[in-house]
Structure formats: C-alpha cells, structure tokens
Amino acid sequence: MYGALDISTSALVAQRTRLTVIAANVANKDAILKARGEYEPYRRRFVVFATGDPARGSAQGVHVASIQIDQGRLTPKYQPGSPFADADGYVEYPNVDSVVEQMNALEALRAYEANITAIEATKSMISVALQILA
C-alpha cells in the first residue's frame, strides 16, 4: 500500500509543477521585454508528463519530463507609437490565452484533488489493516 502513496505523491508533485508553470504564463501574459529590457515577447510554457519515477527507479507514478516553450504564433497588437512596433505598426505580444490557462489550471486542480482523495483512501486502508493486525 505504500507504493500507492508514492504514486499519488508523484502525481501531486507533477501537478504542482504544472500549476506553477500556468501561474508563470498568466503572470507574463503581457511581458514583451526580457529582464534587461530587450524586446523579446514571453512565450507560453507547458509541462510534459512521463510515466514512472526515475528518482526511485520505479515504472509507476508520474514525473515532469520537461517544460517546453510553445512556439505557436505570437499575438500582434496594433500600436504604431510603440518603439517595438514593426513597419506596419504591430507589436507582438505573448502567445498566452487567459481562458486556456484558466482551463489548464482547473484541470490541474482537479487532478491534484483526485490524487489527494487517492491518498486519503490509501491511508484509510492502511489504518484498517493495522487495526486488524493489532
């Protein structure tokens, strides 16, 4: 039964990472400059999950295999007075869609809650087993 706890815990860690990436996307939704002031619109990130837990050498559970950068099209906004505008007056903004990020956050939350429920069920089973053995 402790394996079940490990599996659910790996999912909690993975979903927490996913939610952190989503929060970064939302926070950078309008960021068009790098930290040093150079023009480079932020690009949305997303988490790629993989089965297993390489830290434990287990084929069960889940882990974050990588955090990828979405190479999708940036969002052009007409701002002819901006120093970052192209020849046609457009400034490219991040490819972050607030609605998509909100749905992804909700999905991560539901997955997190489901794994908490699995942990609670496992703890209950362990408790009953200990009562029987005691």
What name fits each language-model region?
Residues 1-134:
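Amphipathic alpha-helical polymerization modules
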